[in-house]
């Protein structure tokens, strides 16, 4: 019985050792691959030959760069471009809106029943309450104020 246990354990150890030796050989091949297999893999028959300008360590002339990227087609914007329409109180106020330098929209200096404001760079309609009119000359950052019929427009405050 004791001999069977020793025999079985020696067979297991022998199989494990054989497997260990094979994996060690594979590991060694992965770390140090044979040089003959990879010798010509990255070498090409057509070697790159730089131009004479590069051989002499000269920079190519500016005209070479310009000619390389130059196109005979010049950009021509469409002649029929129209800005996005701005509708306020169901009225197209695109012509009356000014896109101010601060990114806000406002109706021109004429009093209106509503005005255009800009929230997150999107034009929205801000109607004045009943009985009030819009004055574009006043307000913070070009948004204007709603004023009563007899109120005077003050100078714009920034």
Curated annotation (Swiss-Prot):
Subcellular location: Secreted
Coiled-coil region list: none
Positions of region (Disordered): 32-80
BP GO annotations: defense response to bacterium; defense response to virus; innate immune response
Primary residence: secreted
Biased composition (Polar residues): 41-58, 66-76
Bridged cysteine pairs (disulfide): 88-135, 97-146, 128-153
Induction: By a wide variety of microbial and tissue components such as bacterial flagellin and lipopolysaccharides (LPS), dsRNA (reflecting an antiviral response), cell death signals, monosodium urate (MSU) (the end product of the urine catabolism, which is one of the principal endogenous immunological 'danger signal' in vertebrates).
Signal peptide: 1-17
GO molecular function, one term: chitin binding
InterPro entries for this protein: Chitin-bd_dom
Keywords per UniProt: Antibiotic, Antimicrobial, Antiviral defense, Disulfide bond, Immunity, Innate immunity, Secreted, Signal
Tissue/organ expression: Expressed in the endodermal epithelium and in some interstitial cells in the ectoderm.
Entry-linked Pfam families: CBM_14 (PF01607)
GO cellular component, one term: extracellular region
Protein's job: Antibacterial peptide. May also be active against virus, since it is induced by dsRNA.
Listed name of the protein: Periculin-1
Naturally occurring in which organism (per UniProt): Hydra vulgaris
